[in-house]
């Protein structure tokens, strides 16, 4: 007994020692993760990053962190108009050529100056990536003119090229640092953004530190820590206890509670994203258009919007939302149970069938799936909800392991090319975005025309036609264009919502 007691004491003392001597990633915010002062911002989000390599994944939890580490050639203003970032200016000698003039004196986090060779390396690396190459599809040449000048040529005119170059994944990397890190670059990133990488404790936190030589000036807050806190109730508790300064994407009763608490500030506004129910059209019975149509007529969006989102959003109807240029208000599907049953019978399922829906470990999507489960039961579909960890969810839906799934998509470039091409082009099936594995030659042709048409009105007509076809083909059912929200402690100032839902911390202060 004494030996066991002695062993227990030894274990406890060892654990206390380890906590006291925690690694570098913990020292900046304390071993508990609690905020230690004005020099540190602790942010709670609902999922861990998949990779900090911008060319390795295109997911929101990763983008929230990467937008602090990297800059791009272009940025967008609040109206979605392209603005200079690392490219100071540009000119178009013809419809298929853009010459970019780079800012001088921009430093990477390893101390090297950004040069045209880094831009060429970065764009060519993005073009070679199966995850993000589709964003730059059509570029056929990147040429270094001198240290601060780069020429980009395209096969055909690219109407959205400046918008696409603003995409968070099209970051400019240090060629030297990227090659030195090799396959480990995603865990040891080097960019030229306002914050540099310090550490990543997988599943828990990513720690960043202000970069003193940032070309726009050093960020006001020295340290930023992103905490992976899946349950929004736990994010709320973290804010209430003072362990968190900022929390992202709070829904339900927690949001109302925080809205009414004078200690906090709720910032809510529109975004360029939508939440959708996707169908894997590689698998039966989802390859049958009558089945997809039946499911669409079985759904009533209102209980989802009212109960899960507490009214914070509007019913979806098209593949891009009203905050994206080119949106067309196609007719919504209105719940009609008898029509849905008749369509299922025509498809050969008079008694319905068993089905599975994938959601990631996001409470909002789980709650949405529960309502869908109840609604589809009315037409005989017995729906099983499977919760899949975020990284496994992305990998599995890229392979096509799923049946139905709930996911979101943000048209972060504010241009319909990105809002549509990634989701419905035959060329982007899988990881690039088309997780419904939808293929329609007519749509593919129209998408290519939309990419190259420079006349805005003709372009808008092309995207209107695509939206009408998607409404009929239903590779996905658009559930909601949700509002986004962030809740901060009252002493956090200058936080601005990004319509693309990847919030830049540069400029935020803590009093």
Where are these regions (language model features)?
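C-terminal motif of bacterial Sec signal peptides marking the signal peptidase cleavage site
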Residues: 17-20
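Append "and occasionally in soluble cytosolic enzymes with long acidic Gly/Pro-rich linkers
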Residues: 267, 287-374, 379, 439, ...
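Surface-exposed binding/hinge segments that line
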Residues: 91, 134-177
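Ligand-site clamp/hinge motif
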Residues: 211-256
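Aromatic- and charge-enriched surface segment that lines or borders ligand/interaction sites
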Residues: 88-129, 145, 151, 285
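Short, solvent-exposed loop/beta-turn-alpha elements that line the ligand-binding surface or hinge
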Residues: 59-93, 168-192, 197, 213-221, ...
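Alpha-helical secondary-structure segments
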Residues: 116-122, 147-151, 193-194, 221-223, ...
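Ligand/substrate-recognition segments at binding pockets and active sites
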Residues: 345-411, 481-484
């Amino acid at each position: 007994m004494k030996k066991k007691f002695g062993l227990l004491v030894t274990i406890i003392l060892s654990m206390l020692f380890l906590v006291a001597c925690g690694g570098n990633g913990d020292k900046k915010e304390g071993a508990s993760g609690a905020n230690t002062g004005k020099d540190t911002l602790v942010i709670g989000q609902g999922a861990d990053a998949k990779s900090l390599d911008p060319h390795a994944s295109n997911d929101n939890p990763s983008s929230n962190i990467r937008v602090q580490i990297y800059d791009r050639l272009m940025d967008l203003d609040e109206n979605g108009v392209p603005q200079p970032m690392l490219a100071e200016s540009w000119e178009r000698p013809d419809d298929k050529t853009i010459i970019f003039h780079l800012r001088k004196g921009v430093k990477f986090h390893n101390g090297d100056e950004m040069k045209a060779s880094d831009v060429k390396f970065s764009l060519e690396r993005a073009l070679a990536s199966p995850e993000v190459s589709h964003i730059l599809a059509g570029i056929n040449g990147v040429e270094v003119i001198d240290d601060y000048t780069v020429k980009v040529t395209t096969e055909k005119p690219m109407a959205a090229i400046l918008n696409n170059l603003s995409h968070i994944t099209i970051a400019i990397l240090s060629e030297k640092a990227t090659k030195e890190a090799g396959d480990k670059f995603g865990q040891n990133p080097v960019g030229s953004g306002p914050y540099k990488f310090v550490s990543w404790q997988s599943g828990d936190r990513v720690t960043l530190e202000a970069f003193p030589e940032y070309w726009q000036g050093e960020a006001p807050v020295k340290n930023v820590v992103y905490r992976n806190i899946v349950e929004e109730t736990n994010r709320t508790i973290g804010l209430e206890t003072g362990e968190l300064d900022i929390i992202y994407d709070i829904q339900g009763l927690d949001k109302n509670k925080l809205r009414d608490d004078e200690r906090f500030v709720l910032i809510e506004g529109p975004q360029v994203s939508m939440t959708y129910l996707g169908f894997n059209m590689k698998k039966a019975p989802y390859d049958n258009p009558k089945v997809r149509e039946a499911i669409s007529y079985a759904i009533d969006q209102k209980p989802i919007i009212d109960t899960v989102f507490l009214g914070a959003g509007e019913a979806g109807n098209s593949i891009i939302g009203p905050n994206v240029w080119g949106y067309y208000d196609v007719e919504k599907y209105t719940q009609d149970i008898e029509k849905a049953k008749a369509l299922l019978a025509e498809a050969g399922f008079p008694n319905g069938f068993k089905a599975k829906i994938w959601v990631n470990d996001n409470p909002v999507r789980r709650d949405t799936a529960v309502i869908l489960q109840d609604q589809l039961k009315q037409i005989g579909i017995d729906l099983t909800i499977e919760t899949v960890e975020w990284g496994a969810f992305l990998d599995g839906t890229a392979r096509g392991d799923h049946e139905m799934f709930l996911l979101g998509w943000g048209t972060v470039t504010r241009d319909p090319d990105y809002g549509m091409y990634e989701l419905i082009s035959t060329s982007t099936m899988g990881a690039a975005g088309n997780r419904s594995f939808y293929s329609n030659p007519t749509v593919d042709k129209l998408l290519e025309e939309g990419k190259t048409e420079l006349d805005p009105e003709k372009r808008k007509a092309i995207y209107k036609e695509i939206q009408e076809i998607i409404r009929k083909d239903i590779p996905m059912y658009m559930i909601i264009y949700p509002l986004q929200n962030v809740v901060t402690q009252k002493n956090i100032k200058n936080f601005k919502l990004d319509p693309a839902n990847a919030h830049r911390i540069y400029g935020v202060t803590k009093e």
